[in-house]
Amino acid sequence: MSFDNAYEAITEENDSRWAFGTGFEDPLSGVDTTVPSGVDGARLAAYCLMLGDDALIFSHRLQEWCTNAPELEDEVAIANIALDLLGQARLLLARAGKADGSERSEDSYAFFRSEQEYRNVRLAELEGGHFGHLIARLLVFSIWRLALLQRLQSSVDPVLAAIADKGVKEVAYHRDYAAQWAVRLGDGTELSHARMQEGLDAVWPYVDELFAAHEVEFVESPSLRPEFDAILDQVLAVATLKRPETGAIAGVSGRMGRDGVHTERMGYLLATLQSVAREHPDATW
């Protein structure tokens, strides 16, 4: 099956492309994945891997909140946000395997890489905490990711542009959901305000990493900071919250998540994420 454009192809309804472990089709089936002239396929693959890992790892952390949210409505909302990010991860990892010519599958990327081979920002792998921690992480992550995806809508790679275009619609909701809860908690009771501020304080040391320049980029990360700050400040003002002043957590010799250097939490996360696939690598069900 072929399509007139990449966006039409990746948004076409085809359930067989979304069923794990049942012989599903490539999520980019029917999409022209030819790397445009003048674009380095290896660099494109590396960049898609970064963004795909961000989505995959943060999706996993959100899934851990299933049955733990304060209301049933929020159970559904958080689960849907996790599924949105998982869908983005699938498309981006599949694009990486096509762009560099390796034909490596999304499952191979997700389940058969070591911790040091993952390229997600460390913010995505932070665990646990209370609901205020979750909302703070989601707020920061979604404000940043939406600004990034909006710029990628004009990417020279039509497949990446289509993935970004689809993602913008999803992450706009994620950002709005997080902002509404940040205001509700921050401008609520004394306890809810304290919890939300605690969440922001905990996540803040990992914010600078989101805007650190990297040798492989299709959008200059530092250019996203002004928009991020402006939007976050608007939310904080309405929520009566303070911008944290804690410093950034440095990497190892300047190396951070994009370089495969992660927090100690990452190993435990991958042990859970990859356990079934590694124990039964050829299983189908």
Feature roles, as predicted:
Residues 29-47, 111-138, 155, 185-189, ...:
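Acidic/His metal-coordination segments adjacent to aromatic residues that form catalytic metal sites
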Residues 58-80, 145-160:
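Helix-loop segments that flank and shape redox-cofactor active sites
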Residues 41-50, 69-88, 134, 159-171:
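Alpha-helical scaffold segments that form or flank carboxylate-/histidine-based iron centers
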Residues 3-12, 82-112, 179-181:
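Conserved alpha-helical segments that form or flank metal/cofactor-binding pockets of metalloenzymes
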Residues 123-177:
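Internal, conserved structured core segments that host functional sites
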Residues 194-285:
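Extended, helix-rich structural scaffolds rather than catalytic motifs
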